[in-house]
Amino acid sequence: MSWQQRVDDALTARRATDTLRRRYVVSQGAGRWLVANGRQYLNFSSNDYLGLSQHPQIIRAWQQAAIRFGVGSGGSGHISGYSVAHQALEEELAQWLGYPRALLFISGFAANQAVITALMKKNDRIVADRLSHASLLEAANLSPAQLRRFIHNDTQHLSRLLQSPCVGQQLVVTEGVYSMDGDSAPLAEIQHIARRHHAWLLVDDAHGIGVTGDEGRGTCWQRGVKPELLVVTFGKGFGVSGAAVLCSESVADYLLQFARHLVYSTSMPPAQAQALSASLAVIRSDEGGERREKLAALVQRFRAGVNASRFTLLNAHSAIQPLIVGDNSRALRLAEALRQQGCWAMAIRPPTVPVGTARLRLTLTQAHEACDIDRLLEVLHGTGE
C-alpha cells in the first residue's frame, strides 16, 4: 500500500462511519457568545467555565507583562526561558494546593506525557481508568511499562488489577472530572486502594481545578485527597492555557532532569504566566466564589429541565453535561439542528468516546444567563431528533 493509499483509506473509513472530524473558523470562540461566518450563537462548547478568558484584570496583566517581557520566553526553562513570572506562578500554585513544588508545562497533554514517560520503566505497571484522557493513555502505551485499564470508576476492578504480581512499581491514573462524561472519580477510595498496594496516584484535574472545592482548589481538595502527582491545566477554569504538575521536592527535581517535554520545549511566554497569576487571584477571591456559585446554579437549572424520556443524561454535576444519543449521524444532525436555532454545540463521536455512545457535549459557563439555559432547553426539546 502506498503512502497516499494509506491516507485516503483512513479518511474514507472515517467518512463512512460519520466520525470525520472538522474544524470551524470562528471570530470569537470563548465566552457566552460564539461568532462564526458573521452569525452569533449561544456558545455551549467552550471550556472557559468561569468566563475568565474575557476578564479585564487578566487581559491587562497579560498586556502589561508582554510590554515588560516581550511576547515569548526565548528558550527552554533550562537555558534562558525561566523568568521571575514563571517562578512566582509556580510558588503561588504550590502554596495554594499544599504541595512543596509545582512545575509549569506548555499544555496538559505535554504534562501528562512528560510525567508518565519520565517515571515509568520496564517491569512497572500503569493501572488507568478506561476513560482516561488520550494524553494519559497514549503516554502509558508509549512507555516501557505494562498498561492495564480498569472499568470506569470501578474500584473493585482496580483493586484486582493491583493485586496481581508486579516486579516494578505501580502507578494508578485517573481524572478528577472526566472530560467526555462530566462525572467524577471516587478519589478517596481510589487513593486508599492505591496506598494499600504501595502504588502512586496520578490525578489529572483539568476540568475540576478552579471550578470546584474551597477557593477553586479542585476535585482532590474537595474530596480530601492528596495524590503523589496532581496535574492541573489552565485552559478551562483559568481561562488561559498551559498546565502544571504538583509534586514533592524530589519528584520535581527528578522531572527537571528526565521529563523531556519540559527540558526540550520552549517555556510558555512570561506574559502568559503573569496572566495565570492574575487568573489565580480572581479564582481565590470572593468574585471567584460568586462565579462558581452561579455556574453551579446554571448546571442545576439545566439538569432539572432536560426531558429524560428523549435524552440520556449522565450522572454529571460538573460544567460538562453530555447528552447521549448513541448514533453518530443522529448526534451530527442534532448539533446542526441546534446551530440552525442559534445554539452552538459539538457532536462527539468515536474514537473520542466508545462506539454507540455518540453525544452532544454541552458545556455551561459562568458567562451564561438563566435565559440562555432556558433557550437551550427549548431548542433541544423542539428538535425532531
Curated annotation (Swiss-Prot):
Q: In which pathway does it act?
A: Cofactor biosynthesis; biotin biosynthesis
User: Which InterPro entries does the protein's record reference?
Assistant: Aminotrans_II_pyridoxalP_BS, Aminotransferase_I/II_large, AON_synthase_class-II, AONS_Archaea/Proteobacteria, AONS_Proteobacteria, PyrdxlP-dep_Trfase, PyrdxlP-dep_Trfase_major, PyrdxlP-dep_Trfase_small
Q: Does the keyword Transport apply?
A: no
Q: Which GO terms describe its biological process?
A: biotin biosynthetic process
Sorted keywords for this record are:
Biotin biosynthesis, Pyridoxal phosphate, Transferase
Report the cofactors. Answer: pyridoxal 5'-phosphate
Report any Pfam family annotated for this entry.
Aminotran_1_2
Q: Which amino acids does the record list as binding pyridoxal 5'-phosphate?
A: 108-109, 179, 207, 233
Known catalysed reaction(s)? 6-carboxyhexanoyl-[ACP] + L-alanine + H(+) = (8S)-8-amino-7-oxononanoate + holo-[ACP] + CO2
The record's GO molecular-function terms, alphabetically, read: 8-amino-7-oxononanoate synthase activity; pyridoxal phosphate binding
Identify which top EC class this enzyme belongs to: transferase
Residue(s) carrying N6-(pyridoxal phosphate)lysine: 236
Q: What is its EC number?
A: 2.3.1.47
Q: List the disulfide bonds.
A: none
* The keyword Transferase is annotated on this UniProt entry: yes
The record lists substrate as bound by 21, 133, 352
Which family is this sequence assigned to?
Belongs to the class-II pyridoxal-phosphate-dependent aminotransferase family. BioF subfamily.
Q: How does it assemble?
A: Homodimer.
* Job description of the protein: Catalyzes the decarboxylative condensation of pimeloyl-[acyl-carrier protein] and L-alanine to produce 8-amino-7-oxononanoate (AON), [acyl-carrier protein], and carbon dioxide.
What the entry lists under PANTHER family is as follows: 8-AMINO-7-OXONONANOATE SYNTHASE, CLASS II AMINOTRANSFERASE/8-AMINO-7-OXONONANOATE SYNTHASE
Name this protein carries in UniProt = 8-amino-7-oxononanoate synthase
Tell me the organism.
Salmonella agona (strain SL483)
Print the organism lineage.
Bacteria, Pseudomonadati, Pseudomonadota, Gammaproteobacteria, Enterobacterales
